[in-house]
Amino acid sequence: MASLRDIQGRITSTKKTKQITKAMQMVSAAKLNRAQHNAQSFTPYTDKIREVVAAIASSGTEISHPMLEERPVKKTGYIVVTSDKGLAGGYNSSLIRSLLNTIKERHNSPDEYGIIIMGRIGRDLFKKRGLPIIQEVIGLPDQPEFNDIKNIARTSVEMFADGIFDELYVWYNHFVSPITQDVTEMKLLPLTDIGSDEKATSASASYEYEPNEQAILEKLLPQYAESLIYGSLLDAKASEFGARMTAMSAATDNASALIEELTLKFNRARQAAITQEITEIVGGAAALE
């Protein structure tokens, strides 16, 4: 049986751990609120660009752009959003596991795909496994600005336009609630379904394009694709903080339960020690009579 000193030491260390997990839970909750606001505020911008691009695509005008055209797939690009830090439950592991299973099903060789990774945890794991990392970005702030990922977003789109990739996907955790994050694969390029946007049919007649539709498309399509990458990052950040808040809440609850259990064990051990001392005193007194 553990001594009173050992039990007391475990209680003290568990209380310190509980203080840390509680603090991390509160910090994550505050960051989650800001991340949700950022993601929700950016959505109208992406929606409006999509509406204009879809209106042009469905206007009947003869337009063409590499980002709208399907071609035989020789190489696929995966933009993967993970976190730099752990202690977020299954936030990273679920995403990475799903991606690895998808890669195994779709590709026979590393020459058939490339990974553009955001986040230290994903970067380290992919390097350890020897997967083909084309580009990486780590150390992103908790509230990222577009400039933080502008280079990697622009490079990703250019690699598709230049024919290095024939299709491009974004993998991230979509925020549903603090306790639920859905692993999401979004096909970024080519934008083959954008002309079917229902809003575009009614909106197409309300736009006049200067100098012409093709010139507008040349400008907007790369911006739209880059905005989708940034929007996915904002969504993933909200998911990360929600997952970490939930994980730290569970850790805090577990610490509380352990402290209660250890306290009960400590009280029983102390009671047994006191009883033993009383028994020894009574026994000693009886022996003196």
Swiss-Prot record:
Principal place of residence: membrane
A GO molecular function annotation here is: proton-transporting ATP synthase activity, rotational mechanism
Record Gene3D superfamilies: 3.40.1380.10, ATP synthase, gamma subunit, helix hairpin domain (1.10.287.80)
Keywords, comma-separated and alphabetical? ATP synthesis, Cell membrane, CF(1), Hydrogen ion transport, Ion transport, Membrane, Transport
Known InterPro entries for this protein? ATP_synth_F1_ATPase_gsu, ATP_synth_F1_gsu, ATP_synth_F1_gsu_CS
Q: Which residues cross the membrane?
A: none
Q: List the membrane topology term(s).
A: Peripheral membrane protein
Q: Name one GO cellular component term.
A: plasma membrane
The answer to keyword Membrane applying to this record is yes
Give the UniProt record's GO annotations in the biological process aspect: proton motive force-driven plasma membrane ATP synthesis
The compartments listed are: Cell membrane
Q: Does the entry feature the keyword Cell membrane, yes or no?
A: yes
Q: What CDD domains does its record include?
A: F1-ATPase_gamma
**Alphabetical list of Pfam families matching this protein:** ATP-synt
Subunit comment: F-type ATPases have 2 components, CF(1) - the catalytic core - and CF(0) - the membrane proton channel. CF(1) has five subunits: alpha(3), beta(3), gamma(1), delta(1), epsilon(1). CF(0) has three main subunits: a, b and c.
Give the protein's biological function.
Answer: Produces ATP from ADP in the presence of a proton gradient across the membrane. The gamma chain is believed to be important in regulating ATPase activity and the flow of protons through the CF(0) complex.
| Family membership noted in the UniProt record | Belongs to the ATPase gamma chain family.
* HAMAP family linked to this entry: ATP_synth_gamma_bact
Q: What is this protein called?
A: ATP synthase gamma chain
Q: From which organism does this entry originate?
A: Alkalihalophilus pseudofirmus (strain ATCC BAA-2126 / JCM 17055 / OF4)
